[in-house]
Amino acid sequence: MELEKVHVVLFPYLSKGHMIPMLQLARLLLSHSFAGDISVTVFTTPLNRPFIVDSLSGTKATIVDVPFPDNVPEIPPGVECTDKLPALSSSLFVPFTRATKSMQADFERELMSLPRVSFMVSDGFLWWTQESARKLGFPRLVFFGMNCASTVICDSVFQNQLLSNVKSETEPVSVPEFPWIKVRKCDFVKDMFDPKTTTDPGFKLILDQVTSMNQSQGIIFNTFDDLEPVFIDFYKRKRKLKLWAVGPLCYVNNFLDDEVEEKVKPSWMKWLDEKRDKGCNVLYVAFGSQAEISREQLEEIALGLEESKVNFLWVVKGNEIGKGFEERVGERGMMVRDEWVDQRKILEHESVRGFLSHCGWNSLTESICSEVPILAFPLAAEQPLNAILVVEELRVAERVVAASEGVVRREEIAEKVKELMEGEKGKELRRNVEAYGKMAKKALEEGIGSSRKNLDNLINEFCNNGT
């Protein structure tokens, strides 16, 4: 059967970590080969437009701006992306996210001027877009930046109230549906299990997002079937909402890399090239663009890297590392401050043999696709649950352990870094991640990959039936 013309609307949340995988999804949709043409319209705000234009250069995607509201309490003027917030705490994240609802009227007005929409994919944080889809009569799918494992574990913890009566932050409790997995209170957002939390603005926002998700036509995950088969199978059997695993989306840009010739090689790439030419292995260190790390913890990380004696490239915000650190490590380390780097290119560099990561899902999938083993240092949100997946289930990562006061000490960091880069454990993790990296590449192969087939099924379902 010949497919009708397909028009997909994408609306990513206003954060680079959320935009990037959805823009990769846009490229995947536009590269899809079947009888009907696909058009993609991406919604954003004026100040985010340049980043999206650059990310989708060379494609036929249409980009539509919707104004972000002015004078939002607590949000500095001119901020339209969470990366620009002074700090990503609930006191700023919640009003920023709530403010996006003020865009709804303009969003719907723009939608009505577009060609018929086959379906919309919008971020789970943009809960109000479900109402827009219902009013205008097209299906909405929710895009989640989490993996399936974290989603079903979270669901089990809340449905079973597993941690409501647990007093200790570190007491392990088995997840009923997955008894081999143990979670702790400290793996979740602080005070999430306090009865008083139900009146908290952040908790209410989560409830709105979950309610909206349950009214949608399904969820798209940036994962692939062979990466977490137990959890994907469980979700499909137990949940009413449909699931489509269409990742790893970071692979979508790979075909462009050979075509784009860099005019000016960045300093960090030159440094990596020098290390490669000298036969030196490098640890890549990055904790995401929005991580909040105490000065004490930063100091311990720095001293741990210094003590480890390994070569490292550290992408860091600000200038809060202890005095004299860079002079002491010399050519063994390179600091990249307040600069946007191409993380995928770093991880794919021949010299990079390990990744000290905060366990954001984008970072973990990029590391797996690049076949680089991970030292897990989860900081917030669902990152501790992501760490459980890569450490205990996939065995592509080792995890640092915090001392009793909650700080990971320099000795622990130095020991785990050396083991990852030079030890037997590191070799085992490298073998495992190489196997998953090959599976990841196969998942997106045209015509035979599981994620390609899942995308085919998604398009067929919503474009032939129109429901």
From Swiss-Prot:
Keyword Glycosyltransferase on entry: yes
EC nos: 2.4.1.-
SUPFAM superfamilies: UDP-Glycosyltransferase/glycogen phosphorylase (SSF53756)
Keyword terms: Glycosyltransferase, Transferase
InterPro entries, per database record: Tudor, UDP_glucos_trans, UDP_glycos_trans_CS
Ranges in a coiled coil: none
Residues engaged in binding UDP-alpha-D-glucose: 289, 341-343, 358-366, 380-383
Class of enzymatic activity (EC top level): transferase
GO MF annotations in UniProt: glucosyltransferase activity; UDP-glycosyltransferase activity
S-S bridge residues: none
Family per record: Belongs to the UDP-glycosyltransferase family.
Protein name per UniProt: UDP-glycosyltransferase 90A2
Gene that encodes the chain: UGT90A2
